[in-house]
């Protein structure tokens, strides 16, 4: 029977891994159990069979077979499999475990608290492990440091280094703690396929196929303002979505006053002490989407068609969006792919954009919608490669502060421009954009992001300095050396 065998196998391997059981004595039993788990319990389609029904004791007169399945049996199998990896790799730390020293050096005049990258394969080889989270990272005070393994084979570490200084981290075999997620996101199918993501600074969202199918014209990135470092998206969406049904009942019962009061209490369009959505996107770039250009017109691919989440915290969130084909000039099936990456501790997302089926070079832009409430509150800096804007939010009279938005172009720009709209759309009167040349087959890389005056960005001058400093730091990354 699978669940019992798996639990015993896990326990015996755990005992060997932690030096409580003699491997020579228990290895034959462990191998017998594991052989059953992989040759009999594991089915060709990946399911786990031969699991007794929940709540029942073993009964030799009753038979289980490959179709006898239950979630707890699968969980027990996976528990044993994880311990099996540590058993084979010997990855539980002991005094004889090899260690790796990692020096992180800051040659700049800025205090740095960056997410840095190493090749995960190199770490696995040096520790003699097959892969996975089978090691622990410590700082100089023997405090565990959170890390993340990415979809593209990187090991991410967060390093805090003073100006013109260095710090040393130590990597050893062992079982890491479960880290608190700060950079994460998901698709909210219950809210018309929103892709929403956040870190300890702010949150954003992109609109999906359900919005496009409904006929709503919302193209750009939206902003979730936060004034707490902990994840808030689940709270935002749960509070907003669960209130809809209750409001409906109150409205139909003629209890409009109670309905309005409930809305004010639960909606994420009001600040209840941890943040709010008070940004209008509409048929614009919103807070930083890209678009190919035809003359002074932007060619939007509208909402994403498909999305794949690549990395899910705790230090980095990344996702790849693909869009429906659009016509650009004579090219009828131009498909945009957009990869966004957000690390812990930063206000800015990395955005890598590529266009398939484009036959000739085009101008490409990324920028920010300028709203009529603050039509002149933008800054364009071609030399340092960014545009920025202070947005008064949906209801300026509510005095909920300002949203500071920016697009940063570390690879340089052809121009920075204010492009007025032919007519006002959703309160927007124009865009402030950075424009580059795009060659077929290239990747257009820029950064977009935002901050809130009710959290950690007091004014536009500080926001500009933040963006400029980030640009400097991109050009001078922390130096990482293995010892």
Describe each PLM feature range.
Residues 175-295:
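Solvent-exposed N-terminal domain segments of exported/luminal and surface proteins
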Residues 9-10, 14-92:
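CBM-like carbohydrate-recognition segments
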Residues 305-364:
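Acidic, contiguous internal or C-terminal segments within carbohydrate-active enzymes
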Residues 154, 159-161, 406-483:
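Beta-strand-rich recognition/accessory modules
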Residues 98-109, 360-419:
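Polysaccharide-binding surfaces and accessory modules of carbohydrate-active proteins
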Residues 167-177, 319-323, 442-454:
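Short, hydrophobic/aromatic-enriched beta-strand segments in well-ordered soluble domains
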Residues 94-186, 217-220, 225, 229-231:
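Alpha-mannosidase-like glycoside hydrolase catalytic domains involved in N-glycan trimming
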Residues 130-155, 327-329, 372-388, 409-422:
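Solvent-exposed beta-strand/loop surfaces of large extracellular or lumenal domains
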